Amino acid sequence: MELGSRRIYTTMPSKLRSSSSLLPRILLLSLLLLLFYSLILRRPITSNIASPPPCDLFSGRWVFNPETPKPLYDETCPFHRNAWNCLRNKRDNMDVINSWRWEPNGCGLSRIDPTRFLGMMRNKNVGFVGDSLNENFLVSFLCILRVADPSAIKWKKKKAWRGAYFPKFNVTVAYHRAVLLAKYQWQARSSAEANQDGVKGTYRVDVDVPANEWINVTSFYDVLIFNSGHWWGYDKFPKETPLVFYRKGKPINPPLDILPGFELVLQNMVSYIQREVPAKTLKFWRLQSPRHFYGGDWNQNGSCLLDKPLEENQLDLWFDPRNNGVNKEARKINQIIKNELQTTKIKLLDLTHLSEFRADAHPAIWLGKQDAVAIWGQDCMHWCLPGVPDTWVDILAELILTNLKTE
């Protein structure tokens, strides 16, 4: 039909009919293509390019940076132990000691955020069990965490040697002193017996009985950090006062030397931990902290008056047992621990290597008491606070929070 010069179609022209019939097909095809590509993109892409290895916080190097942020605490922290409070004791070079920053290979290590950490740990508890190096570790931890809760109070319940309660977060962090982990006690001998062979008495070690200080408290903690090592030497238990090992209440025959005795104690303590400590508890074993005595042991005028960290190529000379140096025991002890823990779920806290460098960071002669060095010698075993244990805390906090996120 035509109106004037305009043509009006009462039916759709063939060209329009054909194009309109194609439109749904095009839309359908487009949707199918989008679906296809979305599925392709969701599939993992295989490649022969190796993915980067997981971050190893324990391998790296110390980097000096005068702009490194100052420690989170100072000499006024109420949880200090006097001999390690190197700021109060006016130790030389404390600014320099704390200007070195640990940089792991291939990744970064963030300084602990005390508020975030305690917030994540709300209503949870952290326990340290072992010798005074775990106490050294704990004191650093307490002073750092107190930044987030200045109302923290000292806590010595449940046979804890030292600790703190953080009421703002309902968190307890404490240390239980158990230097051998196993139960041990002094057994004196009569004067007549001592005169015969020179042995004044013995220390009985029950290899299968945990020390009273921690045997019944592990269920209280959500995180536990164990260690033992520094007492397993002849400087602590010389031939005049040796260790004698017992099992099931009876002396072990033939008698064991110190390191085989340590190995047997370790086997029994690890077995107890796996059997008795709740499976949900996050368990760490801190490897040995190295000593840095130079020129003799602690009781032989050994010294550590160094002003910078060791170089990488010096470490084996100081610590490799094959060189029979003064400080060889750490790696020997560590190998025994690694062998025993390799089939367990206890996580290794390998702080040894990073600490081996830091010969410059011990209290040395700055012990806070006038006659301390004359009586005890230099302290080249424990660490100045603030100092290297603050880096241990950074690493431990990172590992704890990582494990909490994956629960």
Curated annotation (Swiss-Prot):
Location of the protein in the cell: Membrane
UniProt KW Membrane keyword: yes
Membrane-protein topology: Single-pass type II membrane protein
Transmembrane regions listed in the UniProt entry: 21-41
Motif (DCXHWCLPGXXDXWN motif): 379-393
Secretion signal, residue range per the UniProt entry: none
Keywords: Membrane, Signal-anchor, Transmembrane, Transmembrane helix
Entry protein name: Protein trichome birefringence-like 12
